[in-house]
Amino acid sequence: MYASQHATDHPDRPCFIMANTGETVTYAEFEARSNQLAHLLRSHGLQPLDHYSIFMENNSRYLEACGAGERSGLHYTCVNSHLTASELAYIVDNSESQVLITSRELLDIARDALPDCPNVTLCLVVDAPTDSAGASTAIPIVDYATAVGGQPTTPIDDERLGTPMLYSSGTTGQPKGILRALPEQPPGEPLALFRFLSQLWRYRDEMIYLSPAPLYHSAPQAAVGLTVRIGGTVIIMERFDPVQYLELVERYHVTHSQLVPTMFSRMLKLPDDARNRYDLSSLETAVHAAAPCPIPVKEQMIEWWGPIIIEYYGATEAIGFSACDSDEWLAHRGTVGRMMAGELHVLDDDMNECPVGTPGTLWFSTPTRLEYFNDPAKSRESSSADGSMSTVGDVGYVDDDGFLYLTDRKTFMIISGGVNIYPQETENLLIVHPKVADAAVFGVPNADLGEEVKAVVQPAEGIEPGPDLERELINFCQENLSAYKCPRSVDFEVQLPRLPTGKLYKRILRDRYWTDHTSQIS
């Protein structure tokens, strides 16, 4: 999020606009504010390669909090704003962050976490209440605007590109930090990754990008950062709402956006009058990733929006990247594309190459061993013995044309009576049922089979859960899937623990059923 040249060439062009309030920050303002925070971090002792963390909801200070690190040679970690104090403390401590930037809304959680963050020496709070300096911690808690207000608006003397230190989402275990080397290019010089993505996603100058997802996630960070580097305008939604999303496309003549499949599903389930009320003709490119998209959902979206949808697959660890446009997807329905970066190997449990069409663990050749920050055990587990390949545990296969299909995460594979079952297919089917808002499928203990297939469903609004709905959903699965893939029982929840990024926090659900058992899946 380095935009110095645009601040000079187009100082009054909107850099970003907050969707709810309409608050607009120009490129000149963004540049000045990012520089002020960079000066503050330097004055507090942070030098290149040091770390700080950002724990905020989407707000008008978020981008400059990232932008300051990107011009100071710092590693910054954007933390999921839905975490508890103990979860926040783990990431802040594990990342060795020296400064924590948070907001009034999340201050209580941050304050509870600070005693377990020994490296933190300063906590900056956006719109801090006057009584924010509580007695529960010795760490200074300072209002953000007050702290940066007296700092210079010009660049620091020793500008150097910084980079985010991303953490895996933690949906299958403890979050893991992915530390990347600082870029060697001078600030302002185009990065190879951004050139690659701008061509793939068809970005251009003066584009209008609508960002509906939390900014703490790696995908929105990359998309927003690329938009700012190119000189476009970002519309930031504080939280996703399907009707507001469509209204914003029309109001701002949005050209580009990035979504997740759950957002597609929520828009598709709107009444026809709501879906057809807004002019979406300005949209040029809609990118999606983060979670598997059910085939019927993708088909309906392409029919509605036209062939402007691009899908990609790439883990936070950035060890491989595939993509496909709408035409390629329609010719290979269900694919996540062909490899664009990284060399893919589909291997069985004995590390042998799987035949075409046969699922296996996805491994990627890497020039250096994948290293998780301060977690050597997990680093070894995710790398081949010789360090030449890495995996995040995804399972999939490649077809005759080289297109990749994801089957599931190996962590969630069900072994029932010796048969391997990947629950993603069953989840994708349940989600398109008109009475289902969301669904999770996983293995639960079975004395005879080891595990059996369980579905947990969030009913659609106005739908009554109970035995009748359970039978209807099981019958629906049996009509469309092989019997062994179908749930033997269905439980109901008011809300499933799905992250705003679209990923299902399935481990929380599954663990409830394994309290007194040992799962066959690691």
Where in the sequence are the language-model features?
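AMP-dependent adenylate-forming
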Residues: 2-26, 130-133
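Conserved AMP-binding/adenylate-forming core of the ANL superfamily
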Residues: 15-59, 63-67, 84-89
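Conserved AMP-binding A3 loop
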Residues: 24-28, 163-191
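Conserved structural elements of the adenylate-forming
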Residues: 31-36, 149, 178-204, 265-269
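Structural core segment of the AMP-binding/adenylate-forming
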Residues: 43-44, 64-67, 71-147, 157
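AMP-binding/adenylate-forming catalytic core of the ANL superfamily
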Residues: 83, 89-90, 100-102, 247, ...
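Gly/Ser/Thr-rich phosphate-binding loop
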Residues: 161-166, 229-230, 254-259, 270-332, ...
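Conserved AMP-binding/adenylation subdomain of ANL enzymes
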Residues: 186-212, 216-256, 270
